[in-house]
Every structure is written in structure tokens, then in C-alpha cells.
């Protein structure tokens, strides 16, 4: 009986045929299209509703009440502001613009234009008040800077919690940008927080401020007429003692043994400061002093 043996030899040659991987000419899109696999199954149809649908378990009601501040502006203030700021035969007042070079010298070629006369930047044009550009509220920015946070950074976290308690919105931390040895300030330290309010959150904060907080401050004169950035922005501040008059803080004074003052910047669509002051006076903000 003959026996056969199979002997295998290792081949170290690189010329042997190897299978090549296929190359598709169609670009893949499976990583670009997001597929919710939970909706492909026929099970649990009650979980497939959109979160904006009231039948969805994840539905969150948002518009639970009317915006009294916005309704007051639309029903009363808007028409009054149009009448107060009306000027017969008013024309557009041109703001300061950049100036071109005379061209007498060859060095004037490709040179950037000169700054406006008497200003480092261009100023916008002032248009007459019409039905399309009546001054209105845009946003409220609250800034809380804690000087003691350079030694104890936990105070900056407390200031952020104070803003969140008062406004109901999540604040953003503020960090120092430079090193100032004389102030013992280091770059990158959290020094406070700020929050920007729009819509109903802004209306709720302004209503609480004008109806509850400011009337409880003793000998409160109001906002200075010198306040303003010349383009419809009004700024003022509240001390640490004034913050205790907010109902969110007053109801839990034991939880807030230390409060922090804050700066409030009200941004409006007014073109001049006196137009912004007229708008805010309609929301019961008092002003005092001489104008600029």
C-alpha cells in the first residue's frame, strides 16, 4: 500500500497574486444621515411622538401665561413712542464716516482711508422715527464681577448661582484675561458670571425689578441721565444690599448669607440715548439728573 505525503513550501516571493479590496465610487452617507432606530420598531407607538406634541411623555409646556410687559409695549407704548419721537420734515442725519486721501502723493495709493474727524470709528446714520423703526427692547445683559474671587474662587460659583436663582437662566462664567500683579490677579481665574436675557425671561426680570425691587430701596433716586453708550444702551448697577430685595433671595435669606452686586445693561433698538430713556420710562424706570 502506497502512502502519499503532502509537503507544503513557504513562498517568500512578493509576486504572488493577492485579492484586492473593492473600491466603491459612491460616497458613503450613512455617517451623515442620522437615523433614529427607536422609530423603526412598531413597538411603543406612544414614544414616537415629537416632544412638541402634547401626547409625548417628553412634552414640556412653555407658553403658560401671557407676557404682560410685551403686551403693554404693543398696546400702549408703541403708539405713544411714535407720537413723541415724531418730527415734521425730518431728514437722515449722516454719521461720521471714513475720509479718503487727497491723492496728491503716490504714497496715498492702496492706503486705508483716514479715520473720521473727531472720532476713531465710524458712527451710524440717524434715521427719522417711523412705524418701522419704533424703539423697543432687545436684550438685558447682567454682569456680576466678584473682586474677592481672586483669593476664593468659590465666591465666583456663588455669584453664578445667584444669577441663576434670580433670572432662571444658566449664566456663563467670566474669566480674567490678563495677569495684574498689583491686584493679585492671575490670568484664567473665574471672577464672576454673566447672563443674557431675551423674550419672556427678560420681561419677567424687568417686571420684578420695577415692581418689587426698586420700590423697596430706600432713597433710590433712579437711573442717571448721564448713563448711556450714545446708541440706545442704558446701564446701571445694584449693590449687594439691593439684591436681597429680589423675592427669590428674600424668601431664602438663610441660603444666601452673602450676596453680590451686579451691573445691568439694557440694550434697545433706539438710535439715541434720549429715545432709550423715553422707552424705559414707559416701563416705570425713574431717571434723575441733567442729560449729556
Swiss-Prot record:
Domain of life the protein comes from: Eukaryota
Gene3D superfamilies membership: 3.30.1440.10
A GO cellular-component term linked to this record: mitochondrion
GO MF annotations, alphabetized: RNA binding; structural constituent of ribosome
A Pfam family per the record: Ribosomal_L5
Keywords: Mitochondrion, Ribonucleoprotein, Ribosomal protein, Transit peptide
Signal peptide: none
The name this protein goes by in its record: Large ribosomal subunit protein uL5m
Gene (UniProt): MRPL7
